[in-house]
Amino acid sequence: MSNAPKIKVSGPVVELDGDEMTRVIWKLIKDMLILPYLDIRLDYYDLGIEHRDATDDQVTIDAAYAIKKHGVGVKCATITPDEARVEEFNLKKMWLSPNGTIRNILGGTIFREPIVISNVPRLVPGWTKPIVIGRHAFGDQYRATNFKVDQPGTVTLTFTPADGSAPIVHEMVSIPEDGGVVLGMYNFKESIRDFARASFSYGLNAKWPVYLSTKNTILKAYDGMFKDEFERVYEEEFKAQFEAAGLTYEHRLIDDMVAACLKWEGGYVWACKNYDGDVQSDTVAQGYGSLGLMTSVLMTADGKTVEAEAAHGTVTRHYRQYQAGKPTSTNPIASIFAWTRGLQHRGKLDGTPEVIDFAHKLESVVIATVESGKMTKDLAILIGPEQDWLNSEEFLDAIADNLEKELAN
């Protein structure tokens, strides 16, 4: 272990513990890669399913407000209970997704960013840099009213102004004999503007250009508002900073963007409407080869608050092996990057470049360790049958050794 003085992290980091195999790995990461090198104040919340149940989920709410207060959270993967989990843990009720609860309290946009490692094959080999998908997690199909009708009739859309002035009425369609389906959806200008701010803040931070995709040629008013508000926020609030950093912003049609993304090498932020983001984030994750190499960062519109976590689940299958006393080969990379992304933001808020530098070094050490042929089983399988692999602790040992060397330089 290093005898060098620990690097001081000025502000606190809110730590959200989780479940199953990721909880085991999370503690190893903290004990082997974080605490030996950093003098850090951790504001700890146990979001393990039993503790959420014991506190009636109050711990999740408290954790979210702590992140709001301190500006940085790092989160371990958690169980979102279904019927089987309610039975397994004898839960009082089927608690909501902690991620949803935290997002509702903090607001903001979720950005999913792949970790690119040169010797891990990608389904899309040309993607040599990350594509970051920012998904507008509000409105559209996800807050829509939709229903079925089984007889002929008329569908009308009515907007009734709050000031009592004349309503706006659109007769949409006459439904024929056989019936059909109807969908009414909406979005709010303020939410779109906040989404734009978060997307531009992320781009500025990562030093990558930003693209927004819509279908404004068809939805002239609806998607037109996304296009116009992004343009306005960019011109008024970000253009000067973008140009100074040599960055660009562009709106593109969704079909054009999907085609372009397959041709381009990556290295940009792709701001997607709610449904597009839902679909494209999974397409992109698969294209890079592994959810085990995908980080997820929630960033608020003002760019001041960040919560980082791995984009994968709690790895239940490995946890069952672990409970049986067998070694597992669980990929810790996305969880390590949750720590590093949180630390980078903490360093930025505090004005402590040495903290940011430590986080960057840890990231490059992780990538270099895999590129040197040391990795967990999931990555070895992607490379091929000849590739050796390490168990979880051996891989973390290899990273710790390499980090030790890197920091000594």
Swiss-Prot record:
Protein EC: 1.1.1.42
Site (Critical for catalysis): Y142, K215
Biophysicochemical property: temperature dependence: Optimum temperature is 40 degrees Celsius. Retains about 40% activity at 60 degrees Celsius.
Catalytic activity: D-threo-isocitrate + NADP(+) = 2-oxoglutarate + CO2 + NADPH
GO molecular function: isocitrate dehydrogenase (NADP+) activity; magnesium ion binding; NAD binding; zinc ion binding
Family label: Belongs to the isocitrate and isopropylmalate dehydrogenases family.
Protein name, entry field: Isocitrate dehydrogenase [NADP] 1
Organism: Mycobacterium tuberculosis (strain ATCC 25618 / H37Rv)
Gene of this entry: icd-1
